[in-house]
Regions:
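Globin-like tetrapyrrole-binding proteins
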Residues: 1-6, 17-18, 28, 75, ...
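Short, contiguous alpha-helical
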Residues: 24-71, 120-151
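Membrane-proximal intrinsically disordered regions of secretory-pathway and membrane-system proteins
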Residues: 6-7, 105-107, 139
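Short helix/strand-capping connector loops at secondary-structure junctions
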Residues: 81-88, 116-129
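Conserved, structured core segments of small domains
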Residues: 25, 103-110, 117-119
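Short, helix-capping/interhelical loops that line the mouth of catalytic, cofactor-
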Residues: 51-98
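Metal-centered catalytic cores of metalloenzymes
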Residues: 2-5, 103, 151
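Long, hydrophobic N-terminal alpha-helical segment
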Residues: 1-39
Length: 151
């Protein structure tokens, strides 16, 4: 499985981010391209230990069971629900380059920190994840949204 802790996989995502353009057309979903980048950035801050979301009630009930559908080689399903904490609406299209650069910096920090520094804080839906599960999930999350905008 692809994993942001793997250098080749990390570089693939960084290259796809580099090729992302502000005028890329959304293929599905509701977020615009800048909201999507900000969403990815905030979500990557959880395993980096920069934010600490509360567990969703539904996640406490079924998160462990559903986790297997996400921690695998299959692409994430389109139009999956998004935790409200990760829905970013108060951002301008002018922030595209800033958010794109921030994404590259956060990915690099995640990789450089290594598994040892991965936060133990539970995922808001899936609960406790190992560092490798975080790496796989984050790679898939970036892949999902980059495909959403054709990158």
């Amino acid at each position: 499985m692809k994993n942001l802790y793997n250098e080749v996989d990390k570089n693939e995502i960084l290259n796809r981010l580099e090729n992302l353009k502000v005028d890329a057309v959304r293929q599905w979903g509701k977020m615009n391209i800048v909201q999507m980048l900000a969403h990815l950035n905030v979500s990557l801050e959880t395993p980096l230990g920069k934010n600490f979301p509360k567990r969703a009630f539904i996640g406490r009930l079924i998160g462990k069971l559903v986790k297997k559908r996400f921690i695998n080689d299959q692409p994430m399903p389109k139009n999956s629900p998004t935790d409200k904490m990760y829905v970013i609406t108060d951002i301008s299209m002018k922030d595209f380059e800033k958010e794109k650069q921030r994404a590259k910096e956060l990915i690099t920090l995640f990789y450089n920190n290594g598994r040892e520094k991965c936060s133990q804080h539970p995922h808001s839906f899936f609960g406790k994840l190992t560092p490798d599960e975080w790496g796989i999930l984050q790679w898939k999350h970036f892949d999902h949204h980059l495909r959403q905008f054709g990158a």
